């Protein structure tokens, strides 16, 4: 989908949300024209997965008792043919590493969205990180490609240089918007936004369109303010009015294809 399709069809994006950023995530999904829905209740997963167009699983505040829940949700989505996006927040922390390993063994995932440090974990590449922010340096293209090949998922690596790869075909967007890293929840929001863009089909360009839309909106917002509070509001405003022609021009000018 592109932004025009989303506003016309209003896909329902179901997010298994953490309890830190759900309102911001819902606002981002809503302002682009999609319909956000949050749930952490196992009893309704089958019904909600049935009506959703995409399912996002965010492990930012995952607890041990919830591991089987996210596996079940991903299985329900898979059986119904709904794309699943995994946001493995701080996956290199031992408890989270174990939980995600268990999830990958028994659950289902179509897209993994994370920062460079998080994606490097899936690629078995050492990468310095601190909390939710990646601070190490490495070849992000290689990291994304290796992670895609190891997991079988499309990888969406976000940061100063965004990379989307299925292991064979890779796209990059090398434009840094520093203000996006000043707000807690931009990664969470991007993961759910990707869900809206892949609601009618999982393709690398669809995932990149989501990332380009988010980064272009951030770039526009940054020209108007660099204060985190006002930037948050301006980002939502830019996403609300962003035009598909602007996004496609941005993609043509800034996105590079690799293989």
Curated annotation (Swiss-Prot):
Pfam families: HK. Its EC number is 2.7.1.50. One of its GO terms (molecular function) is hydroxyethylthiazole kinase activity. It catalyses: 5-(2-hydroxyethyl)-4-methylthiazole + ATP = 4-methyl-5-(2-phosphooxyethyl)-thiazole + ADP + H(+). Keywords: ATP-binding, Kinase, Magnesium, Metal-binding, Nucleotide-binding, Thiamine biosynthesis, Transferase. InterPro entries: Hyethyz_kinase (IPR000417), Ribokinase-like (IPR029056). Its cofactor is Mg(2+). Disulfide bonds: none annotated. Pathway: Cofactor biosynthesis; thiamine diphosphate biosynthesis; 4-methyl-5-(2-phosphoethyl)-thiazole from 5-(2-hydroxyethyl)-4-methylthiazole: step 1/1. ATP binds at residues 113, 158. Substrate binds at residues 38, 185. GO terms for biological process: thiamine biosynthetic process; thiamine diphosphate biosynthetic process. Catalyzes the phosphorylation of the hydroxyl group of 4-methyl-5-beta-hydroxyethylthiazole (THZ). Belongs to the Thz kinase family. HAMAP family: Thz_kinase. This is Hydroxyethylthiazole kinase 1. It comes from Leuconostoc mesenteroides subsp. mesenteroides (strain ATCC 8293 / DSM 20343 / BCRC 11652 / CCM 1803 / JCM 6124 / NCDO 523 / NBRC 100496 / NCIMB 8023 / NCTC 12954 / NRRL B-1118 / 37Y).
